[in-house]
From Swiss-Prot:
Pfam families: Slx4. This is Structure-specific endonuclease subunit SLX4. Signal peptide: none annotated. Regulatory subunit of the SLX1-SLX4 structure-specific endonuclease that resolves DNA secondary structures generated during DNA repair and recombination. Has endonuclease activity towards branched DNA substrates, introducing single-strand cuts in duplex DNA close to junctions with ss-DNA. Belongs to the SLX4 family.
Length: 946
């Protein structure tokens, strides 16, 4: 049989490559293989150096074949554990000594049989060792056959020291059958058996596969069976020929590939699904599709996703939401139960199964509905007006719901499902599709019905979406809209108000309540005006008027009309008065009637008295005036108009007719008496003196010129002087010259002014009407400054007093401080500056004009002006020299000397002119721009701006 190992040398290299891949898998399982590699590496060096040469001399050809068939798994496990890495070296020696190793291997089998019980503890160590060994065993399979004989004896010693005890147990398992096949076993099967023992799962798998291997072969070695069972082709080759089967066994990486087929153990389920791979791809596609739920156009979208999309559409239509949401819950539950029945080993596969179950039924519906859903999103964009109009649509929609089997919809949603009903009505082509929609919403309906109903419902929903876009159905037909317009009122308001969730009826009720309240307010304010606005069209107008009423209650129509009516005739009367005035100026005869209407009542008695005699009328007027003084209420009204009437009846020129002057003097007397009666009681003493008409007449002429005197002095003394003037006045009356006054055209006012000019003193003292020119000429200018009230009065010094002596005054001590004086000085400065007249020379503006033009005021100049033009002064304590000099001057005059008691609160002080810093404080208080003189003060002009 040496020929077989020779040709077998070429294959072991390839199985080594395969085993190298297997070693990589072994390294993944546990950290034990590296430990086993180290221990076995030392054993391999010893075994290859000693035992391979000895056992190679023995005849192993026939025995190798038998051992390879029967006991190869156990022996290979022992030898492979001892020779994981050095197996490559042994490959060369095994070719030379093909038959030397079979004898020592049966020795190892005997201890193996004894130690099988202990294998339970050691298998974990054996497994990692076996995992590493197959790499080397596969490469030098023929070499490992020979050297394994003698080193087996040494192997147990090494195993006692370390983990290589596992190969000893394997040798004992072999018993005493045949030692030759052990090296064959070490090449391939041992590492896999060790791998199976290294992990609990690998051990179990090795046991299961060993049973299969025993079925195929009688050897019963579990380690080799686990590896060979994974690849049945390798086991058949091992059965055919010892060495050839061993070379095939090293292709253990293929069983590792079986681990991939171990995933197919759920192959029955996968076979049922068949499309798992394609579905997994679709499933990979689904997550982005899920994110794209709002877009219903995609046909490849996951079927569950499309179920969600119709729900989104229904979210727009409210009814569709409830229907599809209810349908979704059912397929989700059914899908979960179906997934449980499928019993997929992997959770991911279960999800795929669920998707598969749901997808096929929904795919057809989703594909059919997806283009229609494209119409639905067009409906989704709603304007605020659409939202506002939906309130009106709810009523029409409710009627539609009752028409289209609203029982089911009422169970899920009441009012929100209106658009669905509206959509279902227009779809006369597919009325059969709508009942399955209802069935789909109903839970007892089968899944197939649900799928079909979903597809139909989606189509119906898309159709409904397109028609509500037209709004014709939602807002009813134009005829029905007109009918409703006639039946119900239209609400007008902002979109935000109309878009509220509140029903339109509530808004209408509020509007009616407001209108009623406004009508009640109108009735309460104006009972007569309220009823007309009750007309339908006028009600709205009244509402607007009521708004104005709310803003101003008195501005209502009635009130405004009354005010306007009163105001318009007043304009007419005012226009009449100037015409009457003009008529009096133009024609004195035309003027009196207007005044006669007012004055005829009182003027009659004075006319009668004047007819009796010239003297009595003035007396009567005078007595009437004095009586009026007794009764102040009549003084202002009666006698004044009587005198005016007398003047109107006799309008001679003031210069020619003395009677006119006398009559006007009577008017003045009336005025003077009225003033005196209001201010002074002595006029009441006059009536008894004037009780006699004759005496009164004699006093009457006297009183005219003397009335001014009476106003100024006592009224009773100058009676004699009044009489001659009165007689003159009568003489003047005898010569009438009425045409002169109208020729002047000045009217009564000019005559009055002329009369006032004749009596300057009386007019100045009594009447406010004298020409102001005379007053200004005679009057003196008012003082521009106010003297401080706290200033002590200066004793009048005679001219003999020397002007050089500074006057001394007694003032309160507090006035020495500027803070106490500025409150009185500042107003004086302000009043003086404002009283300055404007200058005619623009190059020399006044101080007030400079201040108004924001010209900087030089403090020194302004202070000098105030000190020169005003008497504003401050106080300074007087020195003893000044006080003595002043007292001496007072003695020379004969005046009393000045003295102050210490601690009495008064001080002898001397006047002091205002200082620049004090004026500066006034400028600052008045926000006046001021500066210090250049080169003076606090650093010059630039630093002094304020």
């Amino acid at each position: 049989m040496p020929a077989s190992p020779l040709p077998a040398l070429s294959p072991p290299a390839s199985p080594r490559r395969n085993t190298s891949g297997a070693s990589a898998l072994g390294s993944r399982k546990a950290d034990i293989p590296p430990d086993a590699i180290r221990g076995f590496a030392t054993v391999g060096s010893l075994v290859r150096s000693e035992h391979f040469a000895q056992h190679f001399d023995d005849d192993i050809a026939g025995k190798d074949q038998e051992q390879s068939r029967k006991k190869s798994p156990e022996d290979v496990g022992n030898i492979a554990a001892t020779k994981k890495k050095p197996g490559k070296r042994a490959a060369t020696t095994s070719t030379a000594d093909g038959e030397a190793k079979p004898k020592p291997k049966p020795r190892a089998r005997k201890p193996k049989a004894a130690d099988e019980e202990a294998v339970i503890i050691d298998p974990e160590l054996r497994l990692p060792a076996a995992k590493v060994s197959p790499f080397f065993a596969a490469e030098g399979a023929p070499a490992a056959i020979e050297p394994s004989d003698e080193p087996v004896v040494d192997v147990p010693k090494l195993t006692k020291a370390g983990k290589p005890r596992k190969p000893r147990a394997k040798k004992e398992n072999v018993g005493g059958e045949e030692a030759v096949p052990k090296p064959k076993r070490t090449r391939v099967t041992k590492p896999k058996a060790a791998k199976a023992k290294a992990g609990g799962k690998s051990q179990e798998e090795a046991c299961v596969e060993s049973a299969h291997f025993r079925k195929s072969e009688d050897t019963g070695d579990e380690t080799v069976a686990g590896v060979l069972a994974t690849r049945k082709s390798a086991t058949t080759e091992n059965v055919g020929s010892g060495e050839a089967s061993i070379w095939d066994v090293p292709q253990s990486p293929k069983p590792k590939k079986k681990r991939a087929p171990k995933k197919p153990p759920p192959d029955p389920v996968i076979n049922n699904l068949e499309l798992d791979e394609a579905v997994s791809r679709r499933r990979d596609w689904t997550p982005p599709r899920d994110t794209a739920i709002p877009s219903p156009f995609t046909d490849s979208v996951g079927k569950e996703n499309k179920q969600i999309e119709p729900d989104a559409d229904n979210g727009g239509f409210t009814h569709m939401i409830s229907n599809f949401a209810y349908a979704q819950a059912l397929p989700a539950q059914v899908a979960s139960t179906v997934a449980d029945s499928a019993t997929g080993t992997m959770a991911a596969t279960k999800r795929r199964r669920i998707e598969l179950l749901d997808v096929p039924g929904n795919q057809t519906t989703s594909r059919n509905s997806s283009p229609e859903k494209g119409k639905a999103p067009k409906k989704k964009p709603r304007t605020i007006t659409d939202i506002a109009t939906e309130q009106y649509q709810h009523r029409a929609a409710q009627l539609d719901q009752s028409d289209v089997a609203s029982d089911f919809f009422q169970s899920h949603t009441a009012v929100t499902k209106v658009p669905l009903n509206d959509a279902s009505l227009p779809n006369g082509d597919a009325p059969t599709k709508k009942p399955p929609r209802k069935r789909s919403t109903s839970k007892p309906a089968s899944e197939k019905e649900k799928v079909g109903s979903k597809a139909r419902s989606k189509k119906a929903s898309t159709k409904a979406a397109a028609k509500p876009k037209h709004i014709a159905e939602k807002l009813l037909s134009p005829g029905s809209a007109l009918m409703r317009m006639n039946k119900q009122d239209i609400l007008f308001g902002t979109s935000s108000q109309l878009a509220l969730e509140e029903p339109p009826t509530l808004v209408r009720q509020l509007q009616h309540a407001l209108k009623e309240s406004e009508v009640e307010a109108d009735l309460s304010s104006n009972g007569m005006i309220a009823p007309p606005p009750r007309w339908p069209k006028l009600d709205k107008v009244v509402g607007k008027r009521s708004l104005w009423d709310a803003s101003s209650r008195d501005v209502e129509g009635g009130m405004l009309e009354h005010m306007e009516d009163v105001y318009i005739p007043e304009f007419d009367r005012t226009q009449d008065f100037p015409l009457l005035m003009d008529g009096t100026n133009d024609q004195p005869d035309g003027a009196p009637p207007s005044f006669a209407d007012i004055d005829d009542f009182e003027p009659a008695p004075p006319v009668i008295i004047s007819s009796d005699g010239p003297t009595p009328p003035p007396t009567t007027s005078r007595t009437s005036q004095r009586k009026a003084n007794d009764e102040p209420d009549h003084v202002m009204e009666g006698p004044v108009f009587e005198d005016i009437d007398d003047f109107d009846f006799q309008p001679p020129p003031s210069n020619q007719n003395v009677e006119f002057q006398d009559s006007f003097a009577d008017d003045d007397e009336i005025l003077h008496t009225s003033v005196q009666s209001s201010t002074h009681p002595p006029p009441r003493l006059r009536p008894p003196a004037t009780s006699d008409p004759m005496n009164g007449s004699s006093k009457k002429p006297r009183g005219c010129p003397a009335k001014s005197q009476s106003a100024i002095a006592t009224s009773g003394s100058p009676a004699v002087a009044k009489e001659p003037k009165r007689t003159k006045g009568k003489e003047v009356k005898s010569a009438p010259a009425p045409p002169t006054t109208p020729a002047k055209g000045s009217g009564r006012f000019i005559d009055i002014d002329e009369i006032l000019d004749s009596d300057d003193e009386a007019l100045q003292a009594l009447s406010p009407t004298p020409p102001r020119i005379h007053n200004f000429e005679n009057s003196q200018p008012l003082p521009l400054y106010s003297v401080s009230p706290t200033r002590a009065k200066k004793p009048k010094a005679d001219s003999s007093v020397d002007s050089k002596i500074v006057p001394v005054h007694i003032i309160p001590t507090a006035h020495l401080e500027w803070l106490n004086l500025k409150n009185s000085i500042f107003p004086s400065i302000t009043s003086h500056i404002r009283s300055l007249p404007s200058t005619r020379d623009p190059s020399k503006p006044s101080w007030h004009e400079k201040i108004l033009m924001y010209d900087p005021i030089v403090l020194e100049d302004f202070t000098a002006y105030l000190n020169a033009k005003t008497s504003l002064r401050t106080w300074r304590r007087a020195t003893k020299i000044q006080s003595k000099a002043w007292n001496k001057a007072q003695k020379s005059i004969g005046a009393q000397e000045i003295g102050v008691v210490e601690g009495g609160g008064n001080v002898l002080a001397v006047e002091k002119e205002l200082e620049a810093w004090q004026v500066q404080s006034w400028c600052e208080s008045m926000s006046v721009c001021c500066i210090w003189g250049e080169g003076r003060g606090k650093g010059g002009v630039r630093k002094g701006f304020y």
